[in-house]
Amino acid sequence: MDKLKKVLSGQDTEDRSGLSEVVESSSLSWSTRIKGFIVCFALGILCSLLGTLLLWVSRKGLFAVFYTLGNITSIGSTMFLMGPLKQLKRMFEPTRLIATILVLLFFVLTLCSAFLWNKGLALIFCILQSLALTWYSLSYIPYARDAVKKCFAVCLT
């Protein structure tokens, strides 16, 4: 567990100055941070699903508000794991670059399809964006992606 804390907080790879340590530190315990991540991520997905259900309501603004709120909450949930500044720095690292781009791309495509194109296409983009967001979030937990890959490999064989 200590190794996981060090990897997520960057203590084993970074030499931090006093000011950056104060700015990036968190007073939350490790278990509270994990619980905060799980709760925020689940609430974000719930808001996104509610927004998706509101896609077929004639007022498209409801869809946009709930879906946007859900995605911001889900992406923000990873800030519990390492802090906001470090997360923003790590969003575009090679290990999660594709997932970050896909999340942002599907978010834009979902809103464009809801307002300009087809609601069915918007639903497909909602599903794809949720999958990309999950993959992005798993990149912050060491070996979580490998575990998911192995689980799916076992299920598919």
From Swiss-Prot:
Location, primary (coarse class): membrane
GO biological process: protein transport; vesicle-mediated transport
A Gene Ontology cellular-component term: membrane
Role description: May be involved in fusion of retrograde transport vesicles derived from an endocytic compartment with the Golgi complex.
Protein name, entry field: Vesicle transport protein SFT2B
Subcellular location: Membrane
Lumenal side: 58-61, 118-120
Gene behind the chain: Sft2d2
